[in-house]
């Protein structure tokens, strides 16, 4: 029989992997497919969580909170992509500086409205049954996070590789001018992708705010972890993001249980090794 501590550590790692995938999947869409350096993605996660918290305070309906957080950040993403990023498209330095500045504004706005103390969204009872699994009792909401991440991964894969919309997106990444010449409005298409990226970050913020807590500063932590996931898996690869999230989540869980002082720094070890051996990531491709 497996040691209960090891079972708990593995399950916690899978839960963290699920949350990281929800965040990183949005980042890999913006960073990998659109070549947009969106370093405000962590701030999207943070603000989405607090918007969901506000909706939950009013409605007490968790699904509305998740939808409100996602849609609210999708609107913020629309503003950012069409008003701010459109004018500096392709200039990576300008995109980096702009998104860093935008994330700082969001963090300060959150601090002004909700304060600096940690807040969390109440877990609904119907999403949090006590589940007996492999000899231990485990919170059902953590398993829900894992299930949700699997559903999102499958949905993204179907959209990108089994639909005409996905074919247009991938063609637009490879040759924007050719797709535009075919009469496809590539600008609107990429705006839609960026809004989806923001929606995923906002929804992940509500999930993370229910699983853990929300506080200014968590945006930077999860931005860094999402970047690690995307770099390990390969930019633009949903499957790579899933592998990167799984690896990072398990490392965070095991290092937190056995080497707590080194927990965060150890997550960078596989990224360094993979960058040295395969700079494009496990499932990524070279970007010219």
Segments from the language model and where they lie:
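Cytosolic-side transmembrane-helix boundaries in multi-pass membrane proteins
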Residues: 5, 113, 174-181, 185-188, ...
């Amino acid at each position: 029989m497996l040691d209960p501590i090891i079972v708990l550590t593995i399950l916690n790692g899978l839960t963290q992997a699920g949350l990281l995938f929800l965040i990183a999947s949005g980042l890999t869409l913006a960073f990998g497919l659109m070549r947009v350096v969106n370093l405000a993605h962590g701030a999207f996660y943070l603000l989405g969580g607090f918007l969901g918290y506000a909706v939950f305070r009013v409605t007490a309906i968790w699904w509305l909170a998740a939808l409100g957080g996602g849609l609210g950040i999708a609107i913020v993403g629309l503003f950012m992509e069409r008003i701010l990023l459109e004018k500096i498209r392709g200039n990576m330095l300008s995109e980096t500086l702009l998104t860093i500045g935008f994330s700082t504004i969001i963090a300060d706005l959150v601090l002004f409205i909700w304060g600096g103390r940690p807040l969390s969204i109440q877990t609904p009872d119907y999403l949090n049954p006590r589940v007996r699994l492999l000899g231990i009792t485990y919170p059902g909401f953590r398993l829900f996070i894992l299930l949700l991440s699997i559903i999102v991964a499958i949905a993204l894969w179907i959209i990108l590789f089994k639909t005409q919309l996905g074919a247009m997106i991938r063609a637009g990444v490879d040759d924007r001018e050719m797709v535009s010449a075919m009469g496809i409005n590539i600008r609107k298409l990429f705006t839609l992708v960026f809004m989806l990226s923001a929606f995923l970050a906002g929804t992940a913020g509500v999930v993370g705010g229910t699983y853990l807590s929300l506080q200014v500063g968590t945006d930077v932590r999860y931005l860094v972890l999402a970047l690690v996931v995307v770099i390990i898996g390969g930019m633009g690869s949903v499957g790579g993001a899933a592998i990167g999230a799984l690896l990072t989540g398990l490392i965070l869980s095991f290092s937190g249980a056995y080497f707590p002082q080194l927990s965060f720094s150890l997550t960078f070890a596989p990224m360094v090794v993979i960058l040295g051996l395969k700079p494009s990531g496990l499932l990524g491709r070279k970007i010219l």
